UniProtKB/Swiss-Prot annotation:
Pfam families: V-SNARE_C. Involved in transport of proteins from the cis/medial-Golgi to the trans-Golgi network. It is a single-pass type IV membrane protein. This is Golgi SNAP receptor complex member 2 homolog memb-1. The lineage of its organism: Eukaryota, Metazoa, Ecdysozoa, Nematoda, Chromadorea. Residues 1-189 are cytoplasmic.
Length: 213
Protein backbone atom coordinates (compact mmCIF):
# COMPACT_ATOMS: atom_id res chain seq x y z
CA UNK A 1 0.00 0.00 0.00
CA UNK A 2 2.77 2.44 0.89
CA UNK A 3 4.44 2.01 -2.51
CA UNK A 4 1.17 2.70 -4.34
CA UNK A 5 0.51 5.73 -2.14
CA UNK A 6 3.94 7.19 -2.88
CA UNK A 7 3.67 6.55 -6.63
CA UNK A 8 0.20 8.13 -6.69
CA UNK A 9 1.48 11.17 -4.82
CA UNK A 10 4.36 11.48 -7.30
CA UNK A 11 1.92 11.23 -10.23
CA UNK A 12 -0.21 13.95 -8.64
CA UNK A 13 2.82 16.27 -8.52
CA UNK A 14 3.51 15.47 -12.18
CA UNK A 15 -0.05 16.47 -13.13
CA UNK A 16 0.36 19.76 -11.28
CA UNK A 17 3.60 20.39 -13.18
CA UNK A 18 1.93 19.52 -16.50
CA UNK A 19 -0.88 21.92 -15.64
CA UNK A 20 1.69 24.71 -15.51
CA UNK A 21 3.03 23.57 -18.89
CA UNK A 22 -0.50 23.66 -20.31
CA UNK A 23 -1.00 27.28 -19.27
CA UNK A 24 2.29 28.18 -20.95
CA UNK A 25 1.56 26.59 -24.35
CA UNK A 26 1.50 28.97 -27.30
CA UNK A 27 -0.86 27.17 -29.68
CA UNK A 28 -3.78 24.79 -29.58
CA UNK A 29 -1.93 21.86 -31.15
CA UNK A 30 0.76 21.76 -28.45
CA UNK A 31 -1.85 22.28 -25.75
CA UNK A 32 -3.95 19.33 -26.92
CA UNK A 33 -0.96 17.00 -26.52
CA UNK A 34 -0.45 18.15 -22.92
CA UNK A 35 -4.19 17.96 -22.20
CA UNK A 36 -4.46 14.36 -23.36
CA UNK A 37 -1.48 13.41 -21.18
CA UNK A 38 -2.98 15.16 -18.15
CA UNK A 39 -6.41 13.55 -18.52
CA UNK A 40 -4.77 10.13 -18.84
CA UNK A 41 -2.85 10.72 -15.61
CA UNK A 42 -6.01 11.93 -13.83
CA UNK A 43 -7.78 8.69 -14.76
CA UNK A 44 -4.84 6.73 -13.35
CA UNK A 45 -4.95 8.80 -10.15
CA UNK A 46 -8.64 8.01 -9.63
CA UNK A 47 -8.05 4.31 -10.23
CA UNK A 48 -5.15 4.34 -7.74
CA UNK A 49 -7.35 6.01 -5.11
CA UNK A 50 -9.93 3.28 -5.57
CA UNK A 51 -7.25 0.62 -5.14
CA UNK A 52 -5.94 2.39 -2.03
CA UNK A 53 -9.46 2.31 -0.58
CA UNK A 54 -9.44 -1.45 -0.93
CA UNK A 55 -6.03 -1.65 0.74
CA UNK A 56 -7.21 0.48 3.67
CA UNK A 57 -9.99 -1.98 4.47
CA UNK A 58 -7.33 -4.68 4.84
CA UNK A 59 -5.14 -2.69 7.21
CA UNK A 60 -4.94 -3.72 10.88
CA UNK A 61 -7.44 -1.83 13.08
CA UNK A 62 -4.63 0.04 14.85
CA UNK A 63 -3.43 1.54 11.55
CA UNK A 64 -6.69 1.73 9.64
CA UNK A 65 -7.79 5.18 10.85
CA UNK A 66 -4.49 6.85 9.98
CA UNK A 67 -4.38 5.12 6.60
CA UNK A 68 -7.95 6.20 5.86
CA UNK A 69 -7.17 9.84 6.61
CA UNK A 70 -4.12 9.78 4.31
CA UNK A 71 -6.08 8.24 1.46
CA UNK A 72 -9.00 10.66 1.93
CA UNK A 73 -6.60 13.62 1.82
CA UNK A 74 -4.98 12.23 -1.32
CA UNK A 75 -8.38 11.75 -2.93
CA UNK A 76 -9.32 15.36 -2.08
CA UNK A 77 -6.07 16.60 -3.67
CA UNK A 78 -6.82 14.57 -6.80
CA UNK A 79 -10.33 16.06 -6.96
CA UNK A 80 -8.99 19.62 -6.66
CA UNK A 81 -6.43 19.01 -9.41
CA UNK A 82 -9.13 17.50 -11.61
CA UNK A 83 -11.29 20.62 -11.17
CA UNK A 84 -8.31 22.89 -11.88
CA UNK A 85 -7.49 20.99 -15.07
CA UNK A 86 -11.09 21.29 -16.28
CA UNK A 87 -11.18 25.03 -15.51
CA UNK A 88 -7.87 25.73 -17.29
CA UNK A 89 -8.85 23.62 -20.30
CA UNK A 90 -12.22 25.38 -20.57
CA UNK A 91 -10.62 28.82 -20.31
CA UNK A 92 -8.01 28.03 -22.97
CA UNK A 93 -10.62 26.50 -25.29
CA UNK A 94 -12.68 29.68 -25.08
CA UNK A 95 -9.56 31.75 -25.75
CA UNK A 96 -8.73 29.70 -28.86
CA UNK A 97 -12.31 29.94 -30.10
CA UNK A 98 -12.33 33.72 -29.64
CA UNK A 99 -9.00 34.03 -31.49
CA UNK A 100 -10.29 31.86 -34.35
CA UNK A 101 -13.50 33.86 -34.65
CA UNK A 102 -11.54 37.12 -34.63
CA UNK A 103 -9.23 35.88 -37.39
CA UNK A 104 -12.18 34.74 -39.47
CA UNK A 105 -13.89 38.08 -38.96
CA UNK A 106 -10.81 39.96 -40.11
CA UNK A 107 -10.75 37.88 -43.30
CA UNK A 108 -14.48 38.15 -43.97
CA UNK A 109 -16.07 40.60 -46.34
CA UNK A 110 -19.82 41.11 -46.45
CA UNK A 111 -21.36 41.44 -49.94
CA UNK A 112 -25.00 42.62 -49.70
CA UNK A 113 -26.52 43.08 -53.18
CA UNK A 114 -23.18 42.10 -54.78
CA UNK A 115 -21.55 45.20 -53.30
CA UNK A 116 -18.29 44.60 -51.40
CA UNK A 117 -18.37 46.14 -47.93
CA UNK A 118 -15.41 45.77 -45.58
CA UNK A 119 -15.64 46.26 -41.82
CA UNK A 120 -14.02 49.47 -40.59
CA UNK A 121 -11.43 49.73 -37.90
CA UNK A 122 -13.96 51.04 -35.40
CA UNK A 123 -16.26 48.03 -35.85
CA UNK A 124 -13.32 45.63 -35.57
CA UNK A 125 -12.16 47.30 -32.35
CA UNK A 126 -15.69 47.14 -30.93
CA UNK A 127 -15.97 43.47 -31.83
CA UNK A 128 -12.61 42.71 -30.19
CA UNK A 129 -13.78 44.40 -27.01
CA UNK A 130 -17.03 42.46 -27.02
CA UNK A 131 -15.15 39.20 -27.55
CA UNK A 132 -12.79 40.10 -24.73
CA UNK A 133 -15.71 40.88 -22.41
CA UNK A 134 -17.36 37.56 -23.21
CA UNK A 135 -14.09 35.73 -22.60
CA UNK A 136 -13.50 37.46 -19.26
CA UNK A 137 -17.06 36.71 -18.15
CA UNK A 138 -16.69 33.05 -19.11
CA UNK A 139 -13.37 32.91 -17.25
CA UNK A 140 -15.00 34.39 -14.14
CA UNK A 141 -17.87 31.89 -14.28
CA UNK A 142 -15.44 28.99 -14.70
CA UNK A 143 -13.29 30.19 -11.81
CA UNK A 144 -16.36 30.76 -9.63
CA UNK A 145 -17.60 27.24 -10.37
CA UNK A 146 -14.17 25.84 -9.52
CA UNK A 147 -14.15 27.80 -6.23
CA UNK A 148 -17.60 26.51 -5.28
CA UNK A 149 -16.60 22.93 -6.10
CA UNK A 150 -13.42 23.38 -4.07
CA UNK A 151 -15.40 24.72 -1.10
CA UNK A 152 -17.84 21.83 -1.39
CA UNK A 153 -14.98 19.33 -1.48
CA UNK A 154 -13.36 20.93 1.56
CA UNK A 155 -16.67 20.83 3.43
CA UNK A 156 -17.09 17.12 2.68
CA UNK A 157 -13.52 16.49 3.80
CA UNK A 158 -14.10 18.41 7.03
CA UNK A 159 -17.22 16.40 7.76
CA UNK A 160 -15.32 13.19 7.11
CA UNK A 161 -12.45 14.31 9.33
CA UNK A 162 -14.88 15.31 12.08
CA UNK A 163 -16.55 11.91 11.97
CA UNK A 164 -13.21 10.12 12.05
CA UNK A 165 -12.04 12.30 14.94
CA UNK A 166 -15.13 11.22 16.86
CA UNK A 167 -14.33 7.59 16.18
CA UNK A 168 -10.70 8.05 17.18
CA UNK A 169 -11.73 10.05 20.26
CA UNK A 170 -14.10 7.33 21.39
CA UNK A 171 -11.47 4.67 20.75
CA UNK A 172 -8.91 6.64 22.78
CA UNK A 173 -11.38 7.58 25.52
CA UNK A 174 -11.33 11.35 24.99
CA UNK A 175 -13.53 13.42 27.31
CA UNK A 176 -16.88 14.85 26.26
CA UNK A 177 -15.49 18.39 26.48
CA UNK A 178 -12.80 17.55 23.93
CA UNK A 179 -15.37 16.04 21.58
CA UNK A 180 -17.56 19.14 22.02
CA UNK A 181 -14.63 21.35 21.02
CA UNK A 182 -14.24 19.25 17.88
CA UNK A 183 -17.97 19.55 17.14
CA UNK A 184 -17.86 23.32 17.61
CA UNK A 185 -14.90 23.60 15.23
CA UNK A 186 -16.74 21.58 12.59
CA UNK A 187 -19.81 23.82 12.93
CA UNK A 188 -17.63 26.93 12.60
CA UNK A 189 -16.04 25.50 9.45
CA UNK A 190 -19.51 24.82 8.06
CA UNK A 191 -20.56 28.43 8.74
CA UNK A 192 -17.42 29.69 6.97
CA UNK A 193 -18.23 27.40 4.05
CA UNK A 194 -21.77 28.81 3.73
CA UNK A 195 -20.51 32.41 4.01
CA UNK A 196 -17.89 31.74 1.32
CA UNK A 197 -20.54 30.35 -1.03
CA UNK A 198 -22.83 33.33 -0.44
CA UNK A 199 -20.04 35.88 -0.98
CA UNK A 200 -18.94 34.13 -4.17
CA UNK A 201 -22.51 34.09 -5.54
CA UNK A 202 -23.05 37.77 -4.65
CA UNK A 203 -19.78 38.75 -6.36
CA UNK A 204 -20.64 36.81 -9.52
CA UNK A 205 -24.16 38.33 -9.60
CA UNK A 206 -22.84 41.86 -9.05
CA UNK A 207 -20.26 41.44 -11.81
CA UNK A 208 -22.94 40.07 -14.14
CA UNK A 209 -25.24 43.03 -13.43
CA UNK A 210 -22.36 45.45 -13.96
CA UNK A 211 -21.37 43.77 -17.22
CA UNK A 212 -24.95 43.80 -18.48
CA UNK A 213 -25.12 47.51 -17.66
Amino acid sequence: MEALYQSTNFLLQKVQHDLGRLEGTQNEQDAQVVVQCIYGDVITLKENCQTLDNYVSREPPARRQAARMRVDQLRADVHRVDMAVSAVHTRMTQRWRAATERDELLRTRYRPNDTALSIGDHELLLNDRLQSSHTHLDDLISQGSAVLENLKSQHLNLRGVGRKMHEIGQALGLSNSTLQVIDRRVREDWILFVIGCIVCCIFMYAFYRFWRG
